[in-house]
Amino acid sequence: MTTITITRPDDWHIHLRDGAQLKDTVRDISRYMGRAIVMPNLVPPAIDTETALTYYDRIKAQVPAGSQFEPLMVLYLTDKTSPDEIRRAKASGKIVAAKLYPAGATTNSDSGVTDLKNIYPALEAMQEVGMLFLVHGEVTDSSIDIFDRERVFIENILSKIVADFPELKIVLEHITTKDAVDFVTQASDNVAATITAHHLLYNRNHMLAGGIRPHFYCLPILKRNTHQQALLAAAASGSKKFFLGTDSAPHAKDKKEAACGCAGSYTAHAAIELYAEAFESVNALDKLEAFASFNGPDFYNLPRNADTITLVKKPWNVPATYPLGDTNVVPIRAGEAIDWQVE
């Protein structure tokens, strides 16, 4: 039986939601992740230090006994985020980054940034105090094809931010294109990217060919196979610039299986197992530990986790649904087998 032991991984991009759903999302992600960067796009969003810290307390209250799971908090940038707010957030010791959501780009992004120039004072403060800048890299112009929005964002917006703030550490989150891989690879050491398990395992054919499969619908949207292969190559390359970020984003079953379904795929139930499948598919299991457990903390200047987990190649069947507060979520690979499990 094949087994691999790796340093305990972290998730550098997750949506835990709030309220009644929190106990279920925290239960799933805390099983073997040491830490997670928690997205701030709540309703209302975590736009200030106080809101982010009270959210931290709600998450910690749901961490199961015996788990050392630690949430790492993020400030939601708006047109009005002040340099003083950035300094307050950094001083808290619990808020490690601030997030750019272009207004309207994704779930609960309506409070996001309408013009990049509006956050330049905040970015200057972040560069000064060493707070990371997390980016949802898509333009929101309705005239731009949804499959091109990441590429256009990189060309028109991100390249300028990188040039204007050379000392700012930037994470281009949940990259989905060869364009993003190439940009991050060629950029300075201050630019990195997270990659999801579902973008490594699937492409738009899985979502659209032979019937619409709404549980694969996420933002940024799944791209063509050539982009998927570029992501796999980047993740398995050994480059320190790429690391694990699930972007696990639960929605109730009826919100996904609808005439206008929500964007987001749920993978927290089996995150590292799905990544193991992806790395095995390109004969790169030896590169999984660095991607999952080393590159993220190194980029964030945080210590690596001290303990380990063991994965065993032993197929198991994923339930059709998992509880999500007072409703249910359909996970990726629902009703099907996953090849790996945590021992």
From Swiss-Prot:
The UniProt record lists the EC number as: 3.5.2.3
The organism sits in which domain of life?
Bacteria
List the GO terms this entry assigns under cellular component, sorted alphabetically. Answer: cytosol
- Its biological purpose: Catalyzes the reversible cyclization of carbamoyl aspartate to dihydroorotate.
| PANTHER family per record | DIHYDROOROTASE
- Which residues does Zn(2+) 1 bind? H13, H15, K99, D247
Active-site residues, as the UniProt record annotates them: D247
Pathway assigned to this chain's UniProt record: Pyrimidine metabolism; UMP biosynthesis via de novo pathway; (S)-dihydroorotate from bicarbonate: step 3/3
Task: Name the enzyme group at the top EC level.
Answer: hydrolase
Chain sites annotated for binding substrate: H15, L16, R17, N41, H136, L219, H251, A263
Quaternary structure and partners: Homodimer.
Where are the N6-carboxylysine residues found in this chain?
Answer: K99
Instruction: Cite the binding residues for Zn(2+) 2.
Output: K99, H136, H174
Q: What is the name of this protein? A: Dihydroorotase
Q: Which UniProt keywords apply?
A: Hydrolase, Metal-binding, Pyrimidine biosynthesis, Zinc
Q: Which Pfam families match?
A: Amidohydro_1 (PF01979)
The reaction(s) catalysed by this protein are: (S)-dihydroorotate + H2O = N-carbamoyl-L-aspartate + H(+)
State the InterPro entries in the record. Amidohydro-rel, DHOdimr, Dihydroorotase_CS, Metal_Hydrolase
- UniProt cofactor note: Binds 2 Zn(2+) ions per subunit.
- Swiss-Prot/TrEMBL cofactor(s): Zn(2+)
Q: Which family does it belong to?
A: Belongs to the metallo-dependent hydrolases superfamily. DHOase family. Class II DHOase subfamily.
Q: Which gene encodes it?
A: pyrC
Q: Which GO terms describe its biological process?
A: 'de novo' pyrimidine nucleobase biosynthetic process; 'de novo' UMP biosynthetic process
GO terms (molecular function) for this protein are: dihydroorotase activity; zinc ion binding
